[in-house]
Amino acid sequence: MKIAAIGGGVIGGGWIARFILAGHDVTVFDPHPEANRIVTEVMANAAEAWGRLYQSPLPKPGSINWASSIAEAVAGADYIQESVPERLDLKHRIIAEIEATASPQAIIASSTSGFKPSELREGSVHSERVIVAHPFNPVYLLPVVEVVGGGVAAQRASDILVSVGMKPVQIGREIDAHIGDRLLEAIWREALWLVKDGIATTQEIDDIIRYGFGLRWAQMGLFETYRIAGGEAGMRHFLAQFGPALKWPWTKLMDVPEFNDELIDLIAGQSDAQSGAYSIRELERIRDSNLIGIFHALKANDWGAGQTVKAMENRFYARNGKVQADYPLRLHEAHVNGGWVDYNGHMTEFRYLQVLGDATDALLIHIGLDADYRAAGHSAYTVETHIRHLAEVKAGARLTVETRLLGYDDKRLRLHHAILNEDGETVATGEHMLLHVDTKANRTVAMPPALMRALDHLNAQEEGPLPDHAGSGIRAVRLKETSA
């Protein structure tokens, strides 16, 4: 699938990064003289974040190609993401230029935060394929995207967005600013009043959000949070208790403070005092790191945004476990990013196990033990592991894992992995014993014939002697005798 991106700013750069990291080539057009630098910096942040977000092996990144015109960028593209400034006349001109060259079947998705599809489609030749796909920053991490416009194009776009790890929400009726920005604007408007009236500073408002209801919203949203607030009686009790307050009201509603230089200076000054010690890039990295921690917590509970991470990891595992004729198998590669390095300057201990575990997952998928197989109630559990650390691995290294089958029977599987660096040197080995289990009954069971046939096929390729360290335990170092 060929992707085209028109506009490479903060949002456009995030789109570009997400598609490239998911393995797609992207052709970009942006006449801004700093576009290449901006996208390169966003890509660096995104690559670092994905390396920490996903525990599965990542695909080989796609390539970025810079076009000298819109026509060159969209030629042959299947999906076109427009992320130019929020001016309707500009978007009309860009969409017209896209349609002049793009395939009639190509989806044209606008990142607009405010305009409706009906407005974007004015003057369009193939208006049915012009839709809204409005993301949230950082696009390479936050999965939700508001898809507005309906029809076949919206569904096709949603399928594509799911494949790159996003959570498309198709909005059935168009409205100015869609859903997310309408909610954000209400909070923003009220916050401006609180600052202008001297009731709270920017830091106090941010603290109340990030130490309070923001944490609830990140995992429960608005209505589910209030459902819990209603106690055992649920949402009806909450509405009965707090509904009358809507008639008071507490908020400024549609009143907006006069947006003048005085208000701008007040807010900008407080913001500088609050966060001026950090550069924007530093704040972005802090934000990304915190988001990754939240994603991991949600994934552990199979909840909310964590489900999108889990689903994407399953896609990566399935892609990685491709059929391979050569033996020993080379089913997994890894790139050591900066987040994998410890205080000694080399890859930290548990990352070796992660690489070995990813290689085991790739082998299991290779023989047919994939996500569908696990969902049906069977899996393989590792019950014993022996790792040997043979050489240091630095940040930036690219690793390949060679996998051999050392033994098997109807319930057990014994594997050997060798982690190789780019020079072919073995930097670590892992030997693992796995049991085939019925996850519903929580007991060991025999593997089905299809898995046994796949293992028989690997066994037929196993010709060399076992590694001389196979089956050995950790080297003995005895305690010194002490006098009584």
Swiss-Prot record:
<dbReference type="InterPro" id="IPR036291">
    <property type="entry name" value="NAD(P)-bd_dom_sf"/>
</dbReference>
<dbReference type="GO" id="GO:0009437">
    <property type="term" value="P:carnitine metabolic process"/>
</dbReference>
<dbReference type="InterPro" id="IPR026578">
    <property type="entry name" value="L-carnitine_dehydrogenase"/>
</dbReference>
<dbReference type="GO" id="GO:0009056">
    <property type="term" value="P:catabolic process"/>
</dbReference>
<keyword id="KW-0378">Hydrolase</keyword>
<comment type="function">
    <text>Multifunctional enzyme that catalyzes the NAD(+)-dependent oxidation of L-carnitine to 3-dehydrocarnitine and the cleavage of betainyl-CoA (N,N,N-trimethylglycyl-CoA) into glycine betaine and coenzyme A.</text>
</comment>
<dbReference type="InterPro" id="IPR013328">
    <property type="entry name" value="6PGD_dom2"/>
</dbReference>
<comment type="similarity">
    <text>In the N-terminal section; belongs to the 3-hydroxyacyl-CoA dehydrogenase family. L-carnitine dehydrogenase subfamily.</text>
</comment>
<feature type="region of interest" description="L-carnitine dehydrogenase">
    <location>
        <begin position="1"/>
        <end position="322"/>
    </location>
</feature>
<dbReference type="InterPro" id="IPR029069">
    <property type="entry name" value="HotDog_dom_sf"/>
</dbReference>
<dbReference type="InterPro" id="IPR006176">
    <property type="entry name" value="3-OHacyl-CoA_DH_NAD-bd"/>
</dbReference>
<dbReference type="GO" id="GO:0016787">
    <property type="term" value="F:hydrolase activity"/>
</dbReference>
<comment type="subunit">
    <text>Homodimer.</text>
</comment>
<dbReference type="Pfam" id="PF13279">
    <property type="entry name" value="4HBT_2"/>
</dbReference>
<comment type="similarity">
    <text>In the C-terminal section; belongs to the betainyl-CoA thioesterase family.</text>
</comment>
<dbReference type="GO" id="GO:0006631">
    <property type="term" value="P:fatty acid metabolic process"/>
</dbReference>
<feature type="binding site">
    <location>
        <begin position="7"/>
        <end position="12"/>
    </location>
    <ligand>
        <name>NAD(+)</name>
    </ligand>
</feature>
<dbReference type="GO" id="GO:0047728">
    <property type="term" value="F:carnitine 3-dehydrogenase activity"/>
</dbReference>
<dbReference type="GO" id="GO:0070403">
    <property type="term" value="F:NAD+ binding"/>
</dbReference>
<dbReference type="Pfam" id="PF02737">
    <property type="entry name" value="3HCDH_N"/>
</dbReference>
<dbReference type="InterPro" id="IPR006108">
    <property type="entry name" value="3HC_DH_C"/>
</dbReference>
<dbReference type="Pfam" id="PF00725">
    <property type="entry name" value="3HCDH"/>
</dbReference>
<dbReference type="InterPro" id="IPR008927">
    <property type="entry name" value="6-PGluconate_DH-like_C_sf"/>
</dbReference>
<keyword id="KW-0520">NAD</keyword>
<keyword id="KW-0560">Oxidoreductase</keyword>
<keyword id="KW-0963">Cytoplasm</keyword>
<keyword id="KW-0511">Multifunctional enzyme</keyword>
<protein>
    <recommendedName>
        <fullName>L-carnitine dehydrogenase/betainyl-CoA thioesterase</fullName>
        <ecNumber>1.1.1.108</ecNumber>
        <ecNumber>3.1.2.33</ecNumber>
    </recommendedName>
</protein>
<comment type="pathway">
    <text>Amine and polyamine metabolism; carnitine metabolism.</text>
</comment>
<keyword id="KW-0614">Plasmid</keyword>
<dbReference type="GO" id="GO:0005737">
    <property type="term" value="C:cytoplasm"/>
</dbReference>
<feature type="region of interest" description="Betainyl-CoA thioesterase">
    <location>
        <begin position="323"/>
        <end position="484"/>
    </location>
</feature>
